[in-house]
């Protein structure tokens, strides 16, 4: 009988400290960290004094805003959301610690365990090992505690010049770029002939030039819709699987000619046709003239468009078409119902060319989605890079201050595209430069908190 009781106690002790997260505190052999909360921490920041000297000041960080995740399966404790830059992780305090047993921390010097006092400031500049000792004096469990802090400012942007003096871009003009999966496409004109240059996002310094047929293709009209490219040639709709060889689309209904392709969504292909905005939901085979809410002008002189996910519902997308009519800025928006239940027309948003944050007057506009906002660029009259503009109100207000732009000179044509890793590529003809940059926080990875 005594032997059976001894075996049962050992089994209970082992159950209390196994690696399954569903373990409950049912025996004296239980040894789990149930909760752990960071306390008030110090954050040291730099500033310049009036005399120009660098000085440091300290602010408080509420540690509880950065919850600690407990991975019972792999015996790890960490904060998914890193502490802000400058937080002093050498002096970490805890405002709460709940465990089924005594908690000790391994010394960085001797390697021995000492009782952890949550009121003490502890050095977590490197991951530390804590051990929970059960009340039976036998069972224990170790955890690696990793207090993470950002090493870079979230809203800062770092640019890298990945290429310079590329001969393939020496004489290309009217650049227009797209990214498809991991391939960069830069369409343009070389003399009067359309070309496309391609590179992999992993090696944006290596580009391959391809001549395009037919020779009348409008390089600036190219859009990606579904798994194909669409563009215009002599105002007629063309399609391609590789961006190099193009064939006419056999349209059975719609306009006789197109002015420009201005957007592509999950289902909708959008175009300007004279004084109309038209759309197709069958890959350009048939077209419908869309309703306009006013007689305001369309952007027939300089234009760009974009379709992106709606913030209202996953069943909707938002379409934006903007540009210039003469020297006047123009903005139109439309909601697209992916279910096909409702059909909405285009709404004109009057713009004031003299208002702060107005649409910049540029040529060869490029429009992309970035950081849940609209990213706009274009060329100045001489073809040089026109800068980066960001709009968080769907094209009504444009500001440059959010995006740091590299110093670019010598460009005779420039365009922008964005890849799936949130990198912005600035591609410059003439100088043959390619720049790549990203807002730091858009490169941060979110760790899974569902453990198996």
Predicted regions and their residues:
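Beta-propeller fold detector
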Residues: 155-165, 204-214, 247-254, 287-296, ...
């Amino acid at each position: 009988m005594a032997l059976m009781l001894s075996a049962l106690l050992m089994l209970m002790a082992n159950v209390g400290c196994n690696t399954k997260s569903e373990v409950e505190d049912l025996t004296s052999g239980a040894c789990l960290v149930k909760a752990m909360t960071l306390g008030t921490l110090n954050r040291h920041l730099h500033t310049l004094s009036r005399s120009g000297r660098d000085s440091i000041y300290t602010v408080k960080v509420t540690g509880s805003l950065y919850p600690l995740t407990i991975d019972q399966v792999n015996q790890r404790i960490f904060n998914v959301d890193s502490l802000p830059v400058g937080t002093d992780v050498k002096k970490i305090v805890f405002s709460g610690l709940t465990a089924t047993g005594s908690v000790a921390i391994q010394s960085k010097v001797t390697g021995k365990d000492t009782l952890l006092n949550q009121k003490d400031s502890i050095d977590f500049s490197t991951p530390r090992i804590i051990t929970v000792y059960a009340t039976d004096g036998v069972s224990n469990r170790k955890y690696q505690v990793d207090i993470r802090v950002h090493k870079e400012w979230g809203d800062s942007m770092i640019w890298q010049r990945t290429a310079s003096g590329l001969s393939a871009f020496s004489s290309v003009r009217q650049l227009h770029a797209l990214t498809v999966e991991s391939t960069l496409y830069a369409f343009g004109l070389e003399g009067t002939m359309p070309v496309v240059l391609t590179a992999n996002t992993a090696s944006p310094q290596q580009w391959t030039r391809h001549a395009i047929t037919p020779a009348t293709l409008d390089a600036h009209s190219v859009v990606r819709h579904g798994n194909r490219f669409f563009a215009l040639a002599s105002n007629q709709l063309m399609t391609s699987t590789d961006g190099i060889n193009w064939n006419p689309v056999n349209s059975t209904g719609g306009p006789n000619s197109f002015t420009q392709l201005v957007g592509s969504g999950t289902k909708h292909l959008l175009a300007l046709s004279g004084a109309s905005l038209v759309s197709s939901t069958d890959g350009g085979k048939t077209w419908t003239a869309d309703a306009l809410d006013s007689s305001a002008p369309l952007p027939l002189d300089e234009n760009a468009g974009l379709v992106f996910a709606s913030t209202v519902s996953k069943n909707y997308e938002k379409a934006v078409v903007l540009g210039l009519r003469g020297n006047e800025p123009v903005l139109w928006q439309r909601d697209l119902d992916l279910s096909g239940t409702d059909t909405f027309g285009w709404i004109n948003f009057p713009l004031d060319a003299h208002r702060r944050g107005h649409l910049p007057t540029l040529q060869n506009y490029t429009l992309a989605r970035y950081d849940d906002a609209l990213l706009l660029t274009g060329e100045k009259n001489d073809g040089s890079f026109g800068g980066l503009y960001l709009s968080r109100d769907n094209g009504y207000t444009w500001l440059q201050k959010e995006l740091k732009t590299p110093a670019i000179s010598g460009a005779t044509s420039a365009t922008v595209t964005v890849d799936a890793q949130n990198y912005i590529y600035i591609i410059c003809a003439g100088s043959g430069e390619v720049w790549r940059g990203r807002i730091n926080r858009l490169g941060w990875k979110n760790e899974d908190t569902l453990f198996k």
